Amino acid sequence: MRQLPAGPSSLACSGCKAGRLVTVPFSSRDAEDQGSREGIGWQPPGRSWAHTTEQEGKHQVAKATVHPPGPDALLLNQVDPVQCCPTRL
């Protein structure tokens, strides 16, 4: 096999692939799926994404225990509207 000379075209080709992973803009569907969460937009070149239920097209539902409000909790109709939303004059 012949070795190709290391010219600008081969450098551009090798740099192009790594650059694409970083600079590809998200499609509108990706932006909707990811929302405003941080730390998801960039993946180092050469590493594959881990398979999670969210990436498989299913939304991950966090299971949370819902506690009933305590006796000192204010219900919506008990909140003073002046204290909550002051009017601007």
Curated annotation (Swiss-Prot):
Molecular functions (GO terms): calcium-dependent protein binding; DNA binding
Tissue localization of expression: Isoform 1 or isoform 4 (T+ forms) are expressed at equal levels with isoform 2 or isoform 3 (T- forms) in brain.
Chain spans, region Disordered: 27-57
GO-annotated cellular components: cytosol; nucleoplasm; nucleus
Listed GO biological process terms: behavioral response to pain; negative regulation of DNA-templated transcription; negative regulation of transcription by RNA polymerase II; potassium ion transport; regulation of neuron apoptotic process; response to pain; sensory perception of pain
Function: Unknown for isoform 4. Csen is involved in calcium-dependent transcriptional repression, regulation of potassium channels, and perhaps in processing of PSEN2 and apoptosis.
Protein name: Calsenilin isoform 4
Gene source species: Mus musculus (Mouse)
Name of the gene: Kcnip3
